[in-house]
Amino acid sequence: MDKLVPVIPAKEKSFPAIPSSARHAILVPSVRFDDNSRSIIGSLIGIANEETIVLIADNSENIEKKRFLEQIRAINPNIFAVHHEKNIGGQGNFDYLFDWSEGVEFTALMADDDWISPDYHVSAFRYLEKMPHLTGAAVGNSIIMHGSPRERTVDGSQPQMVGETPIERMRKWSGVTSRITMYNASRRSALKNAAAYIRRTPIPAITLLEDLWETNRLALGAFVTKPGKGFLVHNPTPTSSWQDIYQRLHGDSALPFSYIYFSALSTAIQLGIFHTGTLSPLKTKNDKTVCANHLFDHVFKKQFLATVGGQEKVARSQFSKHPRVLEGFLKYCMPPFPDQITFDQNILEWYISLVDALETKPQNGEVPLSEKFRQFSSDLLPTFQLETL
């Protein structure tokens, strides 16, 4: 078996062959090359085999990292790796790995800046094999490292999200801990809709991948947590500043830095689009309506309003020349707030008008970002008659 790590040319999407015996794939989108990332990748040597393979897509543009991955493959050839000639971004790297693992029944993510004991995923894969009604499982313990030195360790294990119906499962979901549970083992079939949506949306959003991934699973089946010896340690602090988040999500887009304060609004809106529209994993109109409204309201209030709610003075100053945007802000973002804020055509059109007001318009005849998002939304929501800006 060839131990070399192939270089994937820019704008090309070729995949090294993986064995037909593979049933589990641990996906590692990687960009770092430090002591921690080397330790994480090296820890996988002991568990990769013909049934449980490891797929690493390297975005580092570091030739030393490529050589390191070849040394890893020389020890265990069931760890497969590619080296992107040019960094294709975090979302592009996720898309690459998800496509590469097509045909493998079970999958899980592993970051190169957190720590997951190798048996954490293997135990969950084995549990899912025995329980065909489940879409995801965590077998072990999740720990979040943040805060002051005396309060750094927090239990991040998410409650079991089980129930007879999708809404029963989604009511137990939290848009915060999905950043941890997205790493847990899943049936690949329970992630396809979310992956298709992420690939098509023209506007990324804060925790959008995590939230779509998680709620796609919950639409189809239960997520359980079980005791085990394995563990996941999540360290969110290195990318916690607004500037870091902006650069990661929108640094090369037409959106200004001020848009970052509306990124959670985008997440809420796109959860509504996903679960209402043609890519929704939900089967009935009632399930789509109830679940989309619940998820939209949850993220809108817990994440978006917690940041900008009630800031009338700032909104009047920023949107003084955009009366439609200001009107929507005063309607949706000022108290008193209703018990549930509903996802509908009006609030979607307000969001699109917000993007239109904030974006830098292209000068070369290209379609503005707001219009791209309007077209994208119209394609997925054929019952909505969205206005052209």
Task: Outline where the language-model segments fall.
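A short, conserved alpha-helix in the catalytic core of glycosyltransferases
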Residues: 190-194, 202-227
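A conserved acidic beta->alpha catalytic loop
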Residues: 57-69
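Short, flexible, basic/aromatic active-site loop/helix in glycosyltransferases
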Residues: 156-177
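Conserved donor nucleotide-binding strand/loop of the catalytic core
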Residues: 73-89
